[in-house]
């Protein structure tokens, strides 16, 4: 149960994310783009959609491989943290639907996106950036120094990708770092302590 529970929570989070993405895509069609983004106005427009798709796929492969090889005993915890982050983001994108930035490049057409990506990412699921926050969560919760460096590099490079390709506003990227830190803090300070106390009492009762 301790291993299957977080995996089930992660699957439920992805389903919640899918429903939220479908909703904001429907609502976002009629919403205007935000014009007053100073950073986007200063950055060049560059088509990095290939890295948007394949770079995130490389991150997904890396997080699974790193978990299995360096954090095998903590896989339930890692799965639970990603479930918490994905669920938090799904809630945020429903609360803050926005029109996509002007000049956003289309990511449709890539084989990987058509098979998997279209169920995970949507044109109007903007606040906050999953391409930034999910690698950054790996940086925060994994323990090996070299693994954390790789995650941080993924986070920064994908953050640059979504900005240059006009797939996110700058606030989506900036907020991703702060919200991810908040999710980790909330779990550590508010969720984990009562869970540990409950689990200790449950184990005592079971052994009695």
Predicted regions, residues:
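N-terminal transmembrane-helix/juxtamembrane module of multi-pass inner/ER membrane proteins
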Residues: 1-60, 105, 203-207
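Alpha-helical transmembrane segments of integral membrane proteins
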Residues: 5-13, 76-84, 150-153, 171
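Aromatic-anchored segments of alpha-helical transmembrane domains
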Residues: 15-19, 86-92, 155-166
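Membrane-embedded alpha-helical segments of multi-pass membrane proteins
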Residues: 52-59, 129, 133, 174-178
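Residues within membrane-spanning alpha-helices of integral membrane proteins
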Residues: 57-60, 83, 137-138, 152-155, ...
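Interfacial helix-loop-helix junctions of multi-pass membrane proteins
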Residues: 125-127, 157-185
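Hydrophobic transmembrane alpha-helices
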Residues: 139-143, 180-188
